[in-house]
Amino acid sequence: MKLVLASASPRRREILKNITEDFIVVASDFDESLIEISRDIQSYVMVLAESKAKSTLCRIESEDFYKDEDEVFIIGCDTVVSIDGKILGKPKDEKEALDMLSELSGRTHEVYSGLAVLDAKKNKIIKDFQCTEVKFSEISYETILKYIACGEYADKAGAYGIQGKASVFVEEIKGSYYNVVGLPINKLYKILLGMGVNL
């Protein structure tokens, strides 16, 4: 049996190690801009997660990666931040990061992660999502600039990483912490067990 994480995120890799060391990383090369942003955020993140899992399946099929394996399970995941129904993905540059963090300052936002686990041999997929509410304290303009200067905002939905220097912005959290980091591990664990994956 092979377990494949379809993500290059070091944070997701570390979280997955909490339940198993027996997996490999084959990052998805799926272009997220191909999926139209939807107001139905739950469906949107699940479609992104499914697309990433299927993209990785295409990669490993073309490389005869799993021809000798009885079972291959591919984990796709995508995380976005939402405030007032608007999706905040990964910032393109420092200005966009500044705009995002200014908008989140002193307010409550939601973090959504979509999960998709693809059984490559049976061509069966299970999808789900998780939502966590996060409340930020008021953050001064100078503090935001200092945070952006450290570079941690890059490649993170909503321009922050809760597990890093931005942890001081967080006043309250309702729901899964690991979901905010990028991989709702409890939900993933249940999906894998339900699909017969022996962890």
UniProtKB/Swiss-Prot annotation:
GO terms for molecular function: dTTP diphosphatase activity; UTP diphosphatase activity. It is found in: Cytoplasm. It catalyses: dTTP + H2O = dTMP + diphosphate + H(+); UTP + H2O = UMP + diphosphate + H(+). Keywords: Cytoplasm, Hydrolase, Nucleotide metabolism. One of its GO terms (cellular component) is cytoplasm. It holds the Pfam family Maf. SUPFAM superfamilies: ITPase-like. The keyword Hydrolase applies. One of its GO terms (biological process) is nucleotide metabolic process. Its EC number is 3.6.1.9. The active site is at residue 78. InterPro entries: ITPase-like_fam, Maf-like. Its cofactor is a divalent metal cation. The record marks 11, 79, 163 as: Important for substrate specificity. Belongs to the Maf family. YhdE subfamily. Nucleoside triphosphate pyrophosphatase that hydrolyzes dTTP and UTP. May have a dual role in cell division arrest and in preventing the incorporation of modified nucleotides into cellular nucleic acids. This is dTTP/UTP pyrophosphatase.
